[in-house]
Amino acid sequence: MDRLDSLVTRRAAVGAIGTVLASSGVVYGASRLDTESDESTGLPFHGSSESTGFGIDLDGHPIMGAPDAALDMYYWGDYQCPFCRRFEQNTLPEIIEKHVRTGTVRIVFIEYPYLSDASMTAAVMDRCVWRQVRDERPSRYWPWHSAVFDAQGEKNSGWASRPNLLEITRGVQDVDATAVDACMRKRGYGIEQEIGTDVEQASSFGIRGSPGFVLYDPTTQEAGKLVGAQPHDRFDAAISKLRNE
């Protein structure tokens, strides 16, 4: 997959979607200020109804890390994407240890289902799981997210069917598969429209596949983009560059 390290100003990047954001509009406080850490990982998750200075609407997206982290990392992924699974297994743990736990980076998880209808099914379920846990047990999103990637099979082989994903969900503690199923039935179409908007916005940033990443510094209003299952040292370099280290 293509790799891009270009460093661009926030205004130039957001201008690509025809939007000019005043610097005073940069918002990083979570609307739900209480963060919860998973007992096994110690990773804080939170939600927000705000938009960032880069133009990302945080509503509906799980956020891992401190609300006041120095940098945002927007991560577009597809549960069927083998490169995303490689990133999750080989690179993400290093990013979490070196940059999330230390308060430097917070990660915003954004769905980019592009491989098939099954990818959209998984993306909608992701939104429904987050909707269920975000207010009282936001950290429970992480075991579900990890379980789905652990169960990944060949793309479009049927492993990401709704019944199979619900079976995976039943195996995750404190995630109610019945409520998730009801959410998909009641809200599925609307959620698909929201995800479609996210995909269009990602495309305007030059994201054409998954995984795709934008690192954004709200202080300098600069951003760096990475595409593909890059090794952790590529992220280390991008983070250092944005922080002028």
How should these model regions be labeled?
Residues 2-18, 28-30, 171-245:
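C-terminal cap of thioredoxin/glutaredoxin-like
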Residues 2-116, 193-194, 238-245:
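Extracytoplasmic thiol/disulfide redox context detector
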Residues 42, 131-138, 187-193, 219:
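Intrinsically disordered, low-complexity coil segments
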Residues 76-78, 110-113, 146-149, 185, ...:
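Active-site-proximal beta-strand/loop segments in catalytic clefts of secreted hydrolases
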